[in-house]
From Swiss-Prot:
It holds the Pfam family PCMT. It is found in: Cytoplasm. It comes from Pelodictyon phaeoclathratiforme (strain DSM 5477 / BU-1). InterPro entries: PCMT, SAM-dependent_MTases_sf. Disulfide bonds: none annotated. It is an enzyme of class 2 (transferase). Its EC number is 2.1.1.77. Belongs to the methyltransferase superfamily. L-isoaspartyl/D-aspartyl protein methyltransferase family. Keywords: Cytoplasm, Methyltransferase, S-adenosyl-L-methionine, Transferase. This is Protein-L-isoaspartate O-methyltransferase. GO terms for molecular function: protein-L-isoaspartate (D-aspartate) O-methyltransferase activity. The active site is at S65. GO terms for biological process: methylation; protein modification process; protein repair. Catalyzes the methyl esterification of L-isoaspartyl residues in peptides and proteins that result from spontaneous decomposition of normal L-aspartyl and L-asparaginyl residues. It plays a role in the repair and/or degradation of damaged proteins.
Amino acid sequence: MQEGKKLLDFRRREMVETLKRYGITNQRVLKAFLEVPRHLFFEVEAWDAAYNDGAYPVGFGQTISQPYTVAFMTSLLVERSPSGKVLEIGTGSGYQAAILDALGYSVFSVERIVALYERAQQRFSRLGLHIACRFGDGTLGWKDEAPFDGIVVTAGAPKAPESLLQQLAENGCMIIPVGGSDAQQMTVIKREEGEFKRELFERFVFVPLVGREGWDDTVF
């Protein structure tokens, strides 16, 4: 058991070194990736794959994103909204939410697939994480808890949902992959003096953001 833990700890350190080689330099982000055991967000039989440099299926057509993707999105957020309340759209395995929690954010997360929502809730409870999670349509956000200093969308959207834009606090930012079903461009939307300013970054491939203000689930 102890040898297994040592191996997983070693592989987590290796993962962080890989993130550095890929250009992730924010020390707060790297520290969070060292602190959060990624394998605990996988089923036990998949622990060997937890620190591989790739996405991994979690069921229901969803994935836990590649470590670099999570780190890249998190870095974009930390550099623009270093503290406060963050809304995550697409809880999935719960790993991204746990990274945000380790960074000291007050984290709220919405998941549209009930089985993933329940599984994430159980993980958060077991790990002692104080993350607010609800089942629902993520494209509509969490109006009762708005405004948010940051919004992180972990699925590809045809455009930024208007409901999410309106739930951004002044000087808050949204990190969202926007584009078609084949690939999406990572986009940062900053709210300044009531206007929304966009920055465009590299392209990624995400599962679709399904919901009233996203994709229709019958399309995929």
